[in-house]
Amino acid sequence: MLPTLTFDLTIQPDWLYEVKYDGFRAILNWDDSGITLTSRNNKPLLPQFPEIKDFLEPLEKLFQPFLPLQLDGELVLLENPYKANFSAIQVRGRTKAAKKIAEHAAKSPCRLMVFDILVLAGRPQHSKTFDERKARLSELFNQLNFPLEADPYSENLLQLVKAHKDFSKLWENVVLHDGEGIIAKQKNSLWEEGKRSLQWLKYKNWKYVSCFITALEKTNGYFYVGVYKEGTIQGIGQVLFGFKPDEKQALQSTIKQNMVREDSQFIYVEPAICLEIKYLELYDNQLREPHFHRFRFELKPTECTYEQFIFKQKNLPEDLDITHPDKPLWKDHDIQKADFILYLREVSPYMLPFLENRILTVIRYPHGMFGEPFYQKNCPDYAPDFVKTHLSEGIDYIVCNNLKTLIWLGNQLAIEYHIPFQTIHSKGASEIVFDLDPPSKEEFHLAVKAALLIKEVLDQLNLIGFVKTSGNKGLQIYLPLPENVFTFEDTRLFTSFIADYLISKDPDSFTTERMKKNRGNRLYVDYVQHSEGKTIVAPYSMRGNEHAGVATPLFWEEVDYSLHPVNFNMESALHRLRKQGDPFKNYFQTKSIQSFGPVLEVLKAKK
């Protein structure tokens, strides 16, 4: 059963919505003869993707009550919960050498994202409605204790594609995570072999590029398009679909009348006709799934540049104009404003959850590091209507709950993002944070020492902590807490206990002395800072310092004396996310299981 492409999706109550992943459509069959995984064209996929079979075979006893079993899904290389890496799985699909296949399977295993069930315990499910099949599929995953939604960090290679009722929220997440799109499915649809159905609709997250026509291919009518890159024409692909018949005919006629040369295959024209094309991504330097969107008669061909093409690939909010994108921001780093905006776009899925529903203080650098910065708490009068605010103690703070607001702030050159320890809805602390701030970068080892000592205590108390760099010269340790349970008076008992513990372990390294002149070269343990109204720099926020630092989340196993704060900058933060994932990925799930209550009771008893 195949979905039909739509450009206009009507939201209806009798439909459900799923993330559309980009990989290989695959049917998993498991019966007495073994496990098979076949593509839509009935091609065996296990030779290229043995990790699926290797994962399932040891679980045969667990699966036995449900066999024979047949599942419908998409074989993908998950990049994040809403996006699969299309180009990477294409490489996997073309790999033939057994050694290379084994290396890929071990290092970057693919996952089968299951969205339908066709046979369960030998009983066909085709006659059931999609709603019924989805319920049975969810029940199966529950019984197996398998992930009920996408998790790129889970070792489980069989994961459920969750069905959502709320299209808007799902679409917001797909756009935020740069996913391919959404599949809409009618609740009462039946599964029909090989049929392209109007009861399943695919709605894609298009990107847009302004380009010009360079040639017409005679045999198939494809229009070749390009952009200017450093003064020369750079081809980016060809387009055929999306034109109305009269538009296509007029365009072909114009090209023939204005050709500069032709050969047996092409009719060539000078750059003159500008148009906008929507596409999914750039794959092998060509537009993937290009469709004509509109003519851009107001554009000059010289305005269709490779730079704007790459910039717009990141799916920035359409109605936001980025001003002065080539403005340099750092003296000793080749970082322009466009680079900073694209950085914010890429880290937004990981940064926004920490900004959500928190009053925001930003530090703006209107001239980059070449001029004076200033703090901004009050929302400026010129802020657009989509920027939401919250009044607190007479100040109308910005609340950054979405990508559009974040990019708008980035365009205002808000480099640093500082947030309180509670949300606007919290009655008490949302987390505990220890700010381990040594006197200088040269004493960074003191922050490492303190962090490792705190980790020992957390482990002994069965508490879960997360660690990040401050982006300057220190480390910060987070303990997520359930909302509306603990007061700041409660958390003060714990922060002062930890401060006293550190000093008792090494009074020559740590101090709670408020006066800087009396601290010497010791690390100041600022447990007083963790209180209502105080702030901390948000995870993934950049810092206005000479090394373009980033408040970078770390894995605990990385925290040792080889760490140095200047190694954590914009470039390294992006590289780490792409290669290692987000160390704070389980942060918010930890809130409900953090066993802080028993620890607090002991501290209160000793008070």
What are these regions (language model features)?
Residues 22-25, 29-140, 279, 285:
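Covalent nucleotidyltransferase
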Residues 1-4, 58-59, 81, 88, ...:
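SsDNA-processing nucleotidyl-transfer enzymes
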Residues 107-110, 211, 219, 254, ...:
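C-terminal accessory nucleic-acid interaction domains of nucleic acid-metabolism proteins
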Residues 10-36, 44, 315-371:
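TRNA-binding/sensing appendages of the translation machinery
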Residues 457-468:
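Active-site palm subdomain of RNA-directed nucleic acid polymerases
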Residues 232-253, 382-393, 444-459, 479-509, ...:
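Helical (often loop-to-helix) elements that flank the catalytic cores of nucleotide-handling enzymes
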Residues 431-433, 466-487, 522-530:
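Histidine-centered divalent-metal-coordination microenvironment in nucleic-acid enzymes
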Residues 2-31, 35-36, 40, 148-253, ...:
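Nucleic-acid 5′ end/cap handling module spanning
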